[in-house]
């Protein structure tokens, strides 16, 4: 596939808006990315991204989730009713520290490159939920209050904090799973957030 001419500055602005120069210490090759396609089909790009690229995004989430000051930004992104397209990720990344922004910038570059030129990736929602339910069982054994936090549905601060804590604990469990399973789980979380992880019901389409 031949890439159309790109507007590198526009894509740079998409990934790195309003960051101080001292924070922009990245060496990312954006020359092969079709900016217009990324902006117009962000959700489709995520669905077509290669497994390795999705796992790179998981690793970026994992590292950021370990930082208390950054975890809440990620948790807001994975709330059941939150938008999780590329623009939403960018708004979240803007709230993170330089190291996490660097990881996400590299991960998104790979997602964009593979998602623009690749075919739709096979995805089994039932298998993804099975991976997440197994991770939830493990997290329940490791962490008191995990399931209570995971299944909370309120919009008050305590409920949101409980879901955030459960999200961080689940991500920590998923890191030890094979890449294939991590990718399945990540694709589900990108589409649905924490919705339906515990109750096992099929997602509405």
PLM regions with names:
Residues 1-4:
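Positively charged n-region of N-terminal signal peptides that target proteins for export
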Residues 7-17:
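Bacterial N-terminal signal peptides
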Residues 15-20, 142:
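Hydrophobic membrane-targeting signal helices
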Residues 23-111:
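N-terminal Sec/ER secretory leader and immediately downstream segment
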Residues 74-78, 135-136, 163-165:
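Sequence contexts marking disulfide-bonded cysteines in secreted/extracellular proteins
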Residues 87-156:
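Extended amphipathic alpha-helical interaction segments
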Residues 155-205:
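A cross-kingdom marker for long, charged
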